[in-house]
């Protein structure tokens, strides 16, 4: 399978929108080489799927971060109507956090300028019957006042295989999540803690 993947000259049809990327080698982690992939946000298609989140949780399982977004039943004590689960590898979480901390207009600064504080994430109870799950490899987040927005994208191993040579990447828009800015900032803080806790498990 690996040999076949390496011989593919172009991105396969159906992998997603092909965008130009800048590949920058980075310092190795755990003895393994790694690189950052950067692209212009304006070149990324906006996901068609939309989800309005009232709350968020963070989990970890089998080497993956689980970002959970929930819609609460109105008039209840946080009982969930629906739940959206986004699964990301730790290396992709690290890429997102690096981007947040090094951005020209840092997320924390943008939130603080509106007087919004990071919210503590609640303790997760149980999944509602209406639960869906997606994979993601890229996160794009933004805030404006009290409102936050997170776009998730996925690039398959097939798409990533040729990136270093072609300087192009096929990205599949997964879902856009609308969430409070304070809740988004609280999630970012917890993701940083998760990375520190599991830093020895990052494989690339």
Name every feature range the model reports, one short phrase each.
Residues 2-204:
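Positively charged, low-complexity terminal tracts
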């Amino acid at each position: 399978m690996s040999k076949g993947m390496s011989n593919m000259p172009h991105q396969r049809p159906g992998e997603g929108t092909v965008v130009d990327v800048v590949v920058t080698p980075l310092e190795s982690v755990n003895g393994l080489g790694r690189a950052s992939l950067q692209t212009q946000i304006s070149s990324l298609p906006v996901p068609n799927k939309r989800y309005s989140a009232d709350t968020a949780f963070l989990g970890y399982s089998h080497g993956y971060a689980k970002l959970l977004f929930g819609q609460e039943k109105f008039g209840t004590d946080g009982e969930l109507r629906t739940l959206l689960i986004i699964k990301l590898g730790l290396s992709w979480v690290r890429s997102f956090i690096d981007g947040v901390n090094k951005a020209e207009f840092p997320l924390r600064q943008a939130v603080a300028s509106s007087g919004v504080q990071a919210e503590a994430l609640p303790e997760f109870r149980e999944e509602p019957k209406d639960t869906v799950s997606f994979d993601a490899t890229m996160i794009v987040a933004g805030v404006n006042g009290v409102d936050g927005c997170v776009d998730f994208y996925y690039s398959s191993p097939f798409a990533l295989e040729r990136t270093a040579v072609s300087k192009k990447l096929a990205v599949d828009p997964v879902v856009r999540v609308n969430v409070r800015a304070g809740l988004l900032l609280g999630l970012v803080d917890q993701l940083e803690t998760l990375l520190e806790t599991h830093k020895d498990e990052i494989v690339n």
